[in-house]
């Protein structure tokens, strides 16, 4: 059985794991705490694929039908 | 005209969506000649227009989205079944499907998959058909006939040579599968298979027949039928029943373009972001198919709310509406008495911050200009 990368699927946008410094910068920029961000489970197939841990912040580059590309953030929870 | 690098850089640095930047660039390129002064003015106008077009703070986007989807929804056909082309695969569409999407039902009423194939399989009808047969769940009824011999108290299965060749399975494999599935002795002789129940009783015998009929000999459990359709210059498989995880691993299937209409399954296999995209696609497609045009932004908002917790949750009592902070807002939606009773027992307090609860108590809602509050300082404080 062959395996394929979940991120290659056309429904899945690009997920980028942020370093703690980058994450801090994002929180500063929006003036929010991490718990206010939308969530993603640590068991999510993409989160597993990029090796995210609980408490990390994932940056998602969505393909948007209106803005072409939009940035979204999710906090990894268990 | 060709844009100088400095201008391109200037456009890139603007706080605008990518689509607007692209439109701005191509618009400028088409123009005959633009002076530095004109360029600056164009940029200023574009940014101003963009800021103007943005949703203002305190705008009730949720209410607008609800109405924008709800009003066209009233014009949808109540009960529609659609047959996808000649391939008579039944798919729920119209209002029932829209309800199914926002209710985040675990299994849709008509699960179906769209399987796209790798280039070498997609162009060849015979190869596409082979993939289809490999995926379709094969039961004993596809391969031959099954009969009970009451004199001998056993089940006699006569396999059809052609049917087995077509589905690439041998009599030995069938016997092996049946042995594994039932745990009984299987007597295979050529294309005839004989099985007997543990206890020689009529009841056991008939039950055994039913069990044998249910065994999946080959293919994916739950995929009852696969049909092939030609779309453009590639063959695409449509299925009745859905099992994304297993189908993605099949030889010849293009795992990056294969989809299902089961949103929960997408969430499990491809993640929450894929589920969000699936909600948007399915909802837009359902509305579009009925000839209704709803701005995608409203549907995006619904999809965002449904997926913001990391799971797909429904818009309803067990999801978005049930999680509202306000007791009155929850009570206004469904099961009023339960919410008020529970709140009374717990001693909940309603801050009257939302729309619904303020309408209930007859106060101005905190939206738009109603959200701005004036705080007065006593004059002696100001003077001091």
UniProtKB/Swiss-Prot annotation, chain A:
Keyword presence, Metal-binding: no
InterPro entries on file: Arch_Rpo5/euc_Rpb5 (IPR014381), RNA_pol_subH/Rpb5_C (IPR000783), RNA_pol_subH/Rpb5_CS (IPR020608), RPB5-like_sf (IPR035913)
One cellular component term from this protein's GO annotations in UniProt: cytoplasm
Keywords, ordered alphabetically: Cytoplasm, DNA-directed RNA polymerase, Nucleotidyltransferase, Transcription, Transferase
Catalytic activity: RNA(n) + a ribonucleoside 5'-triphosphate = RNA(n+1) + diphosphate
Main location: cytoplasm
Compartment(s) of residence: Cytoplasm
GO terms of biological process kind: transcription by RNA polymerase II; transcription elongation by RNA polymerase I; tRNA transcription by RNA polymerase III
Signal peptide bounds: none
Record Pfam families: RNA_pol_Rpb5_C
EC nos: 2.7.7.6
Keyword Transferase: yes
Molecular function GO terms recorded: DNA binding; DNA-directed RNA polymerase activity
Family designation: Belongs to the archaeal Rpo5/eukaryotic RPB5 RNA polymerase subunit family.
Subunit and partners: Part of the RNA polymerase complex.
Alphabetical list of NCBIfam families matching this protein: PRK09570.1
Entry function: DNA-dependent RNA polymerase (RNAP) catalyzes the transcription of DNA into RNA using the four ribonucleoside triphosphates as substrates.
Protein name: DNA-directed RNA polymerase subunit Rpo5
Species, as recorded: Methanothrix thermoacetophila (strain DSM 6194 / JCM 14653 / NBRC 101360 / PT) (Methanosaeta thermophila)
Taxonomic classification: Archaea, Methanobacteriati, Methanobacteriota, Stenosarchaea group, Methanomicrobia
């Amino acid at each position: 059985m062959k395996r394929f990368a979940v991120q290659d699927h056309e429904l899945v946008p690009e997920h980028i794991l942020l370093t703690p410094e980058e994450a801090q910068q994002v929180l500063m920029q929006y003036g929010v705490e991490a718990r206010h961000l939308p969530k993603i489970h640590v068991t999510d197939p993409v989160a597993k694929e990029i090796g995210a841990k609980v408490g990390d912040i994932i940056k998602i580059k969505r393909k948007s039908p209106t803005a072409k590309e939009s940035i979204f953030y999710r906090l990894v929870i268990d | 005209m060709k844009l100088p690098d400095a201008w391109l850089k200037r456009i890139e640095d603007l706080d605008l969506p990518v689509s607007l930047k692209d439109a701005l660039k191509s618009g400028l390129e088409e123009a005959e000649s633009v002076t530095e002064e004109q360029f600056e003015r164009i940029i200023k106008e574009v940014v101003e227009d963009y800021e103007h077009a943005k949703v203002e703070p305190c705008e009730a986007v949720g209410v607008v989205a609800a109405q924008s989807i709800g009003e066209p929804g009233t014009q949808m056909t109540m009960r529609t079944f659609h047959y996808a082309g000649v391939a008579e695969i039944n798919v729920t569409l119209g209002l029932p499907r829209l309800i199914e999407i926002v209710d985040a039902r675990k299994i849709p009423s008509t699960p179906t998959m769209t399987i796209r194939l790798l280039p070498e399989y997609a162009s060849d009808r015979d190869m596409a058909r082979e993939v289809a047969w490999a995926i379709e769940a094969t039961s004993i009824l596809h391969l031959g006939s099954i009969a009970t011999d009451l004199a001998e108290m056993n089940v006699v299965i006569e396999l059809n040579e052609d049917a087995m060749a077509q589905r690439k399975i041998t009599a030995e494999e069938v016997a092996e599968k049946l042995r594994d599935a039932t745990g009984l002795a299987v007597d295979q002789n050529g294309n005839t298979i004989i099985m007997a129940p543990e206890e020689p009783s009529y009841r056991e015998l008939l039950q055994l027949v039913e069990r044998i009929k249910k065994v999946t000999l080959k293919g994916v459990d739950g995929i009852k039928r696969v049909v092939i359709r030609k779309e453009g210059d590639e063959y695409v498989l449509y299925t009745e029943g859905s099992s994304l995880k297993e189908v993605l691993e099949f030889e010849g299937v293009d795992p990056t373009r294969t989809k299902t209409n089961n949103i929960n399954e997408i969430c499990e296999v491809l993640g929450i972001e894929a589920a969000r995209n699936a909600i948007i696609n399915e909802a837009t497609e359902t509305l579009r198919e009925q000839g209704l045009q709803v701005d995608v932004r409203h549907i995006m908002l619904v999809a965002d709310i449904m997926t913001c917790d990391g799971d797909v949750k429904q818009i309803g009592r067990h999801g978005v509406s049930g999680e509202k902070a306000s007791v009155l807002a929850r009570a206004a939606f469904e099961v009023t008495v339960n919410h008020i009773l529970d709140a009374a027992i717990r001693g909940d307090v309603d801050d009257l911050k939302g729309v619904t609860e303020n309408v209930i108590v007859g106060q101005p809602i905190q939206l738009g200009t109603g959200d701005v509050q004036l705080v007065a300082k006593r004059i002696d404080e100001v003077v001091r």
